[in-house]
Regions:
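FAD-binding core/adjacent interface of flavoenzyme oxidoreductases
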Residues: 1-9, 77-147, 218-223, 233-235, ...
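Beta1-alpha1 glycine-rich phosphate/pyrophosphate-binding loop at the start
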Residues: 6-64, 158-181
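Residue-level detector of alpha-helix initiation sites
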Residues: 14-15, 118, 157-158, 279-280
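A Rossmann-like FAD-binding core segment of flavoenzymes
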Residues: 64, 70-99, 104-107, 170-258, ...
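FAD-site-proximal beta/loop scaffold in flavoenzymes
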Residues: 128-144, 236-282, 294-297, 301
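Short hydrophobic beta-strand segments
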Residues: 148-155
Length: 309
């Protein structure tokens, strides 16, 4: 077995990247954590939800505390550069990593934890309202908004499912379908019985103060009336971060747009793992931590069983 500069390189320093690094640090592994300062998907969120012991804590604080823990491990090194190239060396069963300053190093295993970027719909004025009024996870914020007027934006077949889930938190729910609503007669009857309103008008623009009520300006509204909502839930489309590196390694991407992984979060390329939001549609902090721990556990066991390692 050849000598490598590090046992593992972790690309990405959000929740999943930090969790994987912490696990491997406790396993006494040599780890390089590559943090290009990209920020986490939820870096603007005020709270991290459904994380045991961190009920009212900001994502920034959790990440800061974890980084402080990592400072205690002398085999963990940090790097603020970007990874430009990853080349597998099959004869050595390792990888050659080239960084953005043209330096290179060798590692036994690679963990991608670079996440995804959400893509907001093309609605004028929507950007400032993300994520203070625009949400993709009702299980995080909806309880705090219970009883307030809410909206769903879903110009696809998910509108019925989303309405059935979200109506639990409010009796004043409007579903924007951006055109003809594709509900069956049975579904439409059920939504009517629940008091859920369907609006097929196009949203031309939104305005207001982020974190307060949003004004929805609708197409064809001759009276120029606006609909006030405290928040709008959207099943957002997203794109993988660091797609160039993913394609460079020829990793398989699923039809849903995530990296294909096995039960240990190993990708289609042996020795390369993907954790967090880029590897699963259950895109929560809790899953980011789980996937990172599973991958790190599998890597440590695999390296331990290599001959003469």
């Amino acid at each position: 077995v050849s000598y490598c500069d590090y046992d593992v390189v972790v690309v990405g320093a959000g929740f999943s990247g930090l969790a994987a690094t912490l696990f491997l640090a406790n396993a006494n592994r040599r780890v390089l954590l590559v943090d290009s300062q990209q920020g986490t998907r939820n870096h603007q969120a005020l709270k991290a939800y459904n994380v045991v012991g961190y009920g009212n804590t900001s994502p920034h604080q959790i990440i800061a505390e974890t980084n402080e823990q990592l400072d205690e491990f002398n085999k963990v090194k940090r790097c603020s550069l970007q990874v430009n190239r990853i080349m597998q060396r099959e004869v050595y069963d390792d990888f050659l990593i080239t960084l953005s300053d043209a330096s290179s190093l060798t590692v036994k295993r690679v963990i991608f934890a670079t996440g995804v970027t959400d893509l907001l719909p093309n609605i004028e004025g929507i950007q400032p309202f993300w994520p203070h009024n625009i949400f993709h996870c009702p299980y995080c914020i909806a309880y705090e908004l219970r009883g307030l007027p809410l909206a769903i934006y879903s110009p696809n077949d998910e509108a019925y499912m989303m309405a059935k889930i979200i109506h639990k938190w409010t009796n004043d729910l409007t579903v924007f379908t951006e055109g003809q609503a594709n509900f069956s007669a049975e579904q439409q009857h059920e939504l009517d019985q629940l008091g859920i309103k369907i609006n097929t008008q196009k949203i031309c623009a939104v305005s207001g103060e982020p974190g307060q009520f949003m004004n929805f300006h609708l197409e064809g509204d001759k009276n120029h009336d606006v609909l006030l909502r405290r928040g709008m839930f959207i099943h957002l489309e997203f794109q993988l971060n660091n797609r160039a590196l993913i394609d460079q390694l020829d990793l398989v991407i699923t039809a849903e747009g995530i990296v294909s992984v096995d039960s240990n979060y190993q990708t289609s390329q042996a020795g390369v793992y993907a954790v967090g939001d880029m590897s699963h549609l259950f895109q929560k902090i809790s899953h980011a931590l789980h996937s990172a721990n599973v991958a790190a556990f599998h890597i440590d066991h695999g390296l331990a069983m290599m001959p003469y390692y």
